[in-house]
């Protein structure tokens, strides 16, 4: 101490207390301070010492309580809600009400915290109580009142400290106060808590005093811990405890714990779990537990006297120290020792980590004496510094009891632990076990060596080795074509079957959902017109629409899907029909399949003078795959060579039997040019529509399919959408495939703007972020955020599929493709394809895949709808590609850039010519081959010897003989000589050639063994353009 002042931390060291305990007393005495380094005057030190010694005058306490009263009032408000004390016996209530009205509410809170943990502290206090019997009651009550409160806020943190705190008999009171500083008002509130225990059920206390001591131990410990977390629980018995406890001071201590246990439902439940722990340290632990709850009771103020008297008989706190911490551990250890042998057996069997934890505890228990002594020493040392947390021991005991309960089930679960090991063993065995090799595998397309190895359950190295012996150097990431896979699989004794691809016309999505059932309305039918090229599909549609669309088609053939609306009058009512016109050229298979997938009725147009053709059969298969009704329109019946009956006969062979022949297929002979039987055809369409019962819900967000899409240089991405359910409106946010867009405008088939598109309505939509793929389904979303998330995820999926396709394109076949590539003989034709609409791009790419690519491979660097731009020209110049445009134009500056870069730009409007030119370009990349061209045949009729050689006198039988041409000399069936005609003379003069019917002389430098009758074949080698080999 310097100058009569003492720092708080020095005072706490002197008193063997925590700094926070002294700070709590300062709060109670209203002594100002900033931290534990603050100084106290001599008077303030005296006051603190008096409070901590339990002899402090009641005035500071009263002052503290007065200061705390406002805070207590707040808690009183909270407690009062739960406090309805009328539940307790009416006799006890009046006494409690008379004592502390303000503290009654706190009493409810306090029983929860104080009852179990505070007993040890109280036990220490009674030792000093005998010196001042009157005062200790009140002084002990207040510190203890503080003690119960701190546990409530920090119940979870200090449970372990409980055993050590009971040791200091003189200090426990100040310790309680130290924890109290955080909630000063709480001290007053918790005073009634102790009373609550005693009052909890006075009837029971009087009825059965003997069993209560046991129950007291269990509920007290559990009761304080649990109520601390949930303070409102204590509110039920606040009023009862105050006065009933005082009259029965000596008897109350045992009864109070019991009442606490029974009074509150929570303690009762806790008692069930706690009994195990209290039972283990029965002799020493019992009194200790009783002592702890009793100090909680003094919180009321007057009850302290009773509690002090009771605690005085049990001053030896030393027993408490070992019993609370050490003995609960001993029973566990003793109990676990019985399982030592079992645990050892479990180790061998390979038990789980839980069993290992038990074993560790058992191993620690081997030195019981050493551990006990060490624990006792630690408990004694901690007790000097611990105070209020004595309430916590109950909590540790609760968890301890729970583990004990948990351990018991673990014994029952032992077989489960063993089963886990067995499961691991089984998995190990399964890994070691070789999987069964399949006898049959099914393929849809090419696959990589790695995928094939997994499918065949064969090591990848074995497949690579097999390919190597076939002359193919492959890696695990290279793709094998189906023919190669079949040969490899055959080596391993596995059969291969090819899966049939699903038709593109199959309907995969149900547009009308169950939720739409209550709002369904009839919708117009969607009718798709299909058939072979030049059979009159568009002309028939023109006759129906009374327009002339066909005249505007390039080459007179349709190369897009067109959507048209037609109003038809039937039985006096106006009906609307939506027609989809599909191209008939073989390159547009995907378009026809797409049209069939979204259609309700299919019209098959067959020319009466041409009959069933390849695309007719394809259209039939699309209609069957889409499971839509089919109406046959036999067109061009006005021609003289028309044979409708022959067409019906041909269709019968493919399962389409006309109604007049006893079948179910409607067949109508029509003439598109003359307009004959058009009304009959429309009537049949409406009749079939009535049978189909086509419905949709126009009151929901729109869903449908992208029929066609293209990039317009003025309007941006434009898509033709067919609404199949719901209503599409301007401003809707939609996702088509992986493309996000917001509808800015909609245009119908006649070019008029519309604000809404109802079911079965086809419109051109502006406002998409990119050109969607034709055939993609679109859906309208309520908010842009969710729509963007869907579009992003779909874009990622498409990116992955493109990567897989790129890997698959690096295919390896049994031919000489890989060898040619290594030798530089494999040629590539790089193309950049731009078309007017997405469907045309799709059709051209499909046609290019059909071209033979053994000698020359076509690499499409870019395929997209839209006009040819300077960017395309730059890409073509960098990669040596040819730009191919289909029904598109060049952007400004693109033509000049192409001329400067020397890029070849081709534009086409008919797909026939485009494919022919691309095939010709592929053939042009091939090295020309030398072909033998026969010139003529010459017969040797005489042989003239000249010097060391000989000259043959010949007659040209056919063709001609040309000097320096190639010749073959044949004698009978034998080839005598092959070489060059070195000298050719006629009438002793050198000539260039001799025609048939003339005689000539032929001399060779390296051959002179002529004989009469020899035949000389003259020929020459010419270069000929190579064609693509299939």
From Swiss-Prot:
Keywords from the UniProt entry: Cytoplasm, GTP-binding, Initiation factor, Nucleotide-binding, Protein biosynthesis
Biased composition (Basic and acidic residues): 134-144, 188-206
Region ranges (Disordered): 56-361, 394-434
Domain tr-type G: 522-695
Pfam families the UniProt entry points to: EF-G_D2 (PF22042), GTP_EFTU (PF00009), IF-2 (PF11987), IF2_N (PF04760)
Annotated spans, G5: 671-673
Protein name in the entry: Translation initiation factor IF-2
Gene source species: Synechococcus elongatus (strain ATCC 33912 / PCC 7942 / FACHB-805) (Anacystis nidulans R2)
Organism lineage string: Bacteria, Bacillati, Cyanobacteriota, Cyanophyceae, Synechococcales
